[in-house]
């Protein structure tokens, strides 16, 4: 007389395990597809009837390193949970950053509260010349050559949001040419024209 079959054994159990492994692998691949930078972690206190209740806030920048970036702010009782919330919030606010040959199309200034950030295009090989908060946003966005300067507040939150405001204000040369009614050659950077000429050769 055959004994009772164990739950999960046999072909059905193996199929479930394989499916779980495939799903777990897909989730891990999606998680590692993004570049994450924790810009600031602060401990905050809320005064309640029984005393003070502490929690943590995390400012996180997430991007794919290829022109997409977002910023999120998370709050929780533990640091890892605050970071996780910040990552999810950042993914909800993804936006595209116009780039040309690893840099930005034109100089621009971004402002947020007392934070003011100036961004300028740079030639290949320059690298990211920027402070910590600005660098985090630019690296996650996939900008490899750029000059920047913070002209206002030193508050990391203001600096990050000022950088985001600057990147959101960037326009592609095609958009500028169409708005001004000019040919692309009159407004496009030389690097873009050389790249297009090389691609067409």
Curated annotation (Swiss-Prot):
Q: How does this polypeptide assemble, per the annotation? A: Part of the 30S ribosomal subunit. Contacts proteins S4 and S8.
Q: Give the organism's phylogenetic lineage.
A: Bacteria, Bacillati, Actinomycetota, Actinomycetes, Kitasatosporales
Sorted UniProt keywords? Ribonucleoprotein, Ribosomal protein, RNA-binding, rRNA-binding
Q: Name one GO biological process term.
A: translation
Q: Which residues form a coiled coil?
A: none
Residue limits of the S5 DRBM domain?
34-97
Q: What is the protein name for this chain?
A: Small ribosomal subunit protein uS5
Q: Which Pfam families match?
A: Ribosomal_S5, Ribosomal_S5_C
Q: Which family does the UniProt entry place this protein in? A: Belongs to the universal ribosomal protein uS5 family.
Composition skew (Basic and acidic residues), residue ranges = 14-23
Q: Which domain of life is it from?
A: Bacteria
Query: Segment Disordered: which positions?
Result: 1-27
**Summary of the function given for this chain in its UniProt record:** With S4 and S12 plays an important role in translational accuracy.
User: What does its UniProt record remark on the domains?
Assistant: The N-terminal domain interacts with the head of the 30S subunit; the C-terminal domain interacts with the body and contacts protein S4. The interaction surface between S4 and S5 is involved in control of translational fidelity.
HAMAP family under this entry? Ribosomal_uS5_B (MF_01307_B)
- Which species is this UniProt entry from? Streptomyces avermitilis (strain ATCC 31267 / DSM 46492 / JCM 5070 / NBRC 14893 / NCIMB 12804 / NRRL 8165 / MA-4680)
GO molecular function terms here?
Answer: rRNA binding; structural constituent of ribosome
């Amino acid at each position: 007389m055959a004994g009772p079959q164990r739950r999960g054994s046999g072909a059905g159990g193996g199929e479930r395990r394989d499916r779980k492994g495939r799903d777990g692998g897909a989730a891990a691949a999606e998680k590692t597809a993004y570049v994450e930078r924790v810009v600031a972690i602060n401990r905050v206190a809320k005064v309640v009837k029984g005393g003070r209740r502490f929690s943590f806030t995390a400012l996180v920048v997430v991007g794919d390193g290829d022109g997409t970036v977002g910023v999120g702010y998370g709050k929780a009782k533990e640091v890892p949970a605050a970071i996780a919330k910040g990552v999810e919030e950042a993914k909800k606010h993804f936006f595209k950053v116009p780039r040309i040959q690893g840099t930005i199309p034109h100089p621009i200034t971004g402002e947020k509260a007392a934070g003011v950030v100036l961004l300028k295009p740079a030639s290949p090989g320059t690298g990211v010349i920027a402070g910590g908060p600005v660098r985090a946003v630019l690296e996650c966005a996939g900008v490899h050559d750029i000059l920047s300067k913070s002209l206002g507040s030193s508050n990391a939150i203001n600096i990050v949001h000022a950088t985001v405001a600057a990147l959101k204000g960037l326009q592609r040369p095609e958009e500028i040419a169409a708005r001004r009614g000019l040919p692309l050659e009159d407004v496009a950077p030389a690097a873009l024209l050389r790249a297009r000429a090389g691609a067409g050769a």
